[in-house]
Amino acid sequence: MTTQTDDARLNSSEVRSSIEVAAPPERAFEVFTAGIDRWWTRSHHVQTGELKEIGVDPFVGGRMWEENDAGDVCTWGRVLAWEPPSRFAFSWLIGPDWGVPGPDSAGSRVTVTFTPVATGTRVDLVHDRLDAHGEGWESVRAGVGSDGGWPAGLRQFAAAV
């Protein structure tokens, strides 16, 4: 298992991170999407209280959502591409305040590709259009691009595969 983040990209409005997992693309895609609740960092949520569950609706236009321990459900993104087992993309509506997104929230985009390699699957994640979050967007880039952001998420994903 390897992970890397392209540090040069941290100076732009996108973040890139990748990892290789010892599983075929079909399995990697399924764990990344349907199995998101098994690997998502539990402290990474936008609502008050504890994260109870996080999920993905498996179709274009579907929700990226979370439920807290009080039963409140929040949609924080929308599925933009659903192409098993090779590509998955969603909008990221969580802005610089890291709070519950409003109905008119501007969003960035996360695209995840799953490419077969000799040892399994290479998973490449690109979180781009970060500047669409407006003033303070650099804090979103700093958060998702830090070692505790997408790189940590991908390591946890790899452990769940």
Label the predicted regions.
Residues M1-L51:
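Hydrophobic ligand-binding cavity/cleft-lining segments
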Residues A28-F32, M64, V79, F90, ...:
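Hydrophobic pocket/interface hotspot
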Residues T33-D37, P84, R155:
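Solvent-exposed alpha-helix faces
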Residues G35-W76:
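Short beta-edge strand/loop motif at the mouth of beta-sheet-based domains
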Residues W39-W40, W82, W92, L130, ...:
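Tryptophan-centric aromatic hotspots in well-structured domains and transmembrane helices
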Residues I54-G55, W65, D69-G120:
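Hydrophobic-ligand binding "helix-grip"
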Residues L93-D97, V126-H133:
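Short, solvent-exposed aromatic-acidic interface loops
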Residues R129-V161:
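A conserved amphipathic terminal alpha-helix motif
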